Regions:
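Bacterial N-terminal signal peptides that target proteins for export
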Residues: 1-4
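C-terminal motif of bacterial Sec signal peptides marking the signal peptidase cleavage site
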Residues: 13-16
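Zymogen propeptides
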Residues: 18-191
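C-terminal regions of proteins
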Residues: 47-50, 54, 58-76, 310-320, ...
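Short glycine-rich loop/turn motifs
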Residues: 80-84, 171, 232-234, 263-268, ...
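Structural recognition of the beta-strand scaffold that forms the well-ordered cores
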Residues: 124-128, 174-175, 236-237, 270, ...
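Active-site-adjacent helix-turn-beta-strand microarchitecture at beta-sheet edges
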Residues: 135-260
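Conserved, well-ordered active-site substructure
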Residues: 136-164, 244-310, 319-347
Length: 347
């Protein structure tokens, strides 16, 4: 994983918890009395994939509603090796595997490689997800994880560069609500079981004093958090069809270690307006000669071009890995798969 801020857990007065349509073609009538069949919808509109190559057949049998594409040789003007899995969520299902760190005090639950997660469930698509760390013999998730409406981990709710001045950032989450709608938002967990979601991030920056601690009143528009399935990460890349890339407000620059303005392997998840989920991974760190990776701004632009209206960045670097029917896509930068705290699975 890209190193997330902390190697120690601060026990302060609060509870420390961790941290994004296919258009139907009009057919001519041969006979006004005989209805002609509609053309099948593409998983993503052709215009958005005109430079991507459908490589689904390279990975064995996939459900007809899941496709896998390889990127062109360049993305955002840089040499690239990237893959996307695109799933029509009107037919597909997604889920989260995560360690259970719901008490935010660390766990003995083991991290798992994506291959281990695949072997346990044989999901056609498995991709790494949230941030994490280990300390004092315990494993911690720094990112929200919700499975079957149960919170297994929360987005980390504090950050510091010197462990004297403490900030309380909101962090990105990608979720499916109980009614089946998808959304990207910012979240914050407070002690006492108070968990909120926001339409905008807390206005933090390392260059200023900490913003107010998030609450039911700040940032504006707070709602009690609720989701059927959710994964955290950051920064939030796209909201309501607009690029946000809020790494400054989420305090992902500086000491966070994810290097949002530098080229690295990346993982991200998003959804299009017509409920096509897109999981994205790109290679980096010269695993293929000349391929350094992408910035978070690059990833946001790519996902917007692919039609995403909501999207977030996930853990990248050595954690970035996507399996299709158990087969690797990108070359992972650690040389072998890293054991992680959470994954996204699609079938």
């Amino acid at each position: 994983m890209v190193v997330v801020f902390i190697s120690i857990l601060l026990l302060l007065g609060f509870t420390g918890c961790t941290t994004t349509s296919g258009e139907i073609q009009d057919w001519p009538w041969q006979d006004p009395e005989v209805e002609q069949p509609e053309a099948p919808e593409d998983i993503v509109e052709d215009a958005t994939l005109d430079r991507w190559t459908d490589v689904s057949a390279d990975y064995g049998t996939l459900p007809e509603y899941i496709k896998v594409y390889k990127s062109p040789d360049k993305l955002e003007g840089q040499k690239a090796v990237a893959y996307i899995a695109v799933a029509d969520m009107n037919s597909a299902q997604w889920d989260i595997w995560s360690i259970n760190d719901s008490e935010m005090s660390g766990t003995k639950d083991s991290f798992k490689t994506p291959s281990t997660v695949y072997s346990e469930g044989l999901w056609p698509i498995v991709v790494n997800a949230g941030f994490f760390y280990s300390s004092g013999g315990l494993n911690y998730s720094s990112s929200l994880a919700v499975r079957a409406s149960e919170v297994l981990a929360y987005n980390i709710n504090y950050a510091s560069e010197d462990w004297v001045t403490i900030y309380y950032p909101t962090r990105a989450a990608f979720l499916e609500s109980e009614d089946g709608g998808f959304n990207a938002c910012w979240t914050y967990y407070k002690s006492g079981g108070k968990h909120y979601m926001y339409p905008a991030p807390a206005d933090n920056t390392w260059e200023a004093k900490p913003a107010k601690t998030p609450s039911s009143a700040y940032p504006e528009g707070a709602e009690v958090f609720a989701a059927k399935t959710a994964i955290g990460g950051g920064p939030l890349l796209i909201d309501d069809g607009k690029i946000r890339n809020t790494f400054v407000e989420e305090l992902f620059n500086g000491a966070s270690g994810i290097g949002p303005d530098s080229c690295h392997p990346r993982t991200a998840v998003g959804v299009t307006a017509d409920d096509k989920m897109i999981v994205f991974v790109c290679e980096g760190r010269q695993m293929t000669e000349g391929v350094a990776g992408l910035t978070t701004a690059d990833v946001a632009n790519v996902l917007l071009d692919l039609g995403c209206v909501e999207a977030i960045n996930l853990d990248g670097g050595g954690s970035s890995c996507m399996l299709v029917n158990g087969k690797t896509t990108i070359k992972v930068s650690d040389g072998s798969q890293r054991a992680v705290a959470s994954t996204i699975m699609i079938k």
